[in-house]
Design a protein with these regions (language model features):
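Accessory nucleic acid-recognition modules appended to NTPase machines
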Residues: 1-90
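Catalytic cores of nucleic-acid endonucleases
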Residues: 87-90, 103-139
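Short glycine/proline-enriched coil/turn segments at helix->beta-strand junctions
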Residues: 12, 79-82, 95-98, 109-116
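Active-site flanking residues adjacent to catalytic metal/cofactor-binding acidic residues
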Residues: 51, 100, 118
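Conserved catalytic cores of phosphodiester-cleaving nucleases, focusing on short active-site segments
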Residues: 74, 78, 91-106
């Protein structure tokens, strides 16, 4: 989660102004603000993501981690027509009430009811595993 208070102090403005700036960045489609389920602006987002992977590569001064790129791709793919909230675990999102975890095809989890896995580096799906690239068709 972003430290809005520290950022406000660093740039010499109020916390409310920083939140308005962040909201302006979202409206300009430069970032996506991810909240916990049931929360929304003006509450602090749980995660701020670059709007899409093209922007991520264009403005990042470092090489982006594979997980970060895949989560950005996933969120951007489903954002337009679906409600996106942050789930409880790393890489987990709640999409229209469905828990979806973005992870590599080799990562193993215990089977859980109602949890789907958007797996990158996977060509085909099986059961609750869905290849991440298929979400690109939703955009």
């Amino acid at each position: 989660a972003p430290n809005v208070t520290k950022l406000a102090y660093e740039i010499g403005t109020s916390r409310a102004t920083v939140m308005n700036y962040i909201k302006d960045l979202e409206e300009a489609r430069l970032v996506n603000l991810v909240y916990r389920e049931g929360e929304e602006f003006p509450k602090k987002p749980v995660q701020i993501m670059i709007h899409n992977t093209n922007l991520l590569y264009a403005i990042s001064s470092r090489n982006a981690e594979e997980q970060e790129v895949m989560e950005t791709f996933f969120a951007n793919s489903v954002w337009r027509h679906h409600s996106v909230s942050k789930g409880k675990r790393t890489g987990s999102y709640i999409i229209d009430g469905h828990n979806i975890v973005v992870c590599d095809k080799s990562r193993r989890f215990k089977a859980q009811d109602g949890v789907y896995f958007a797996r990158y580096n996977a060509e085909v799906g099986h059961g609750t595993d869905i290849p991440l690239w298929l979400f690109g068709f939703l955009h």
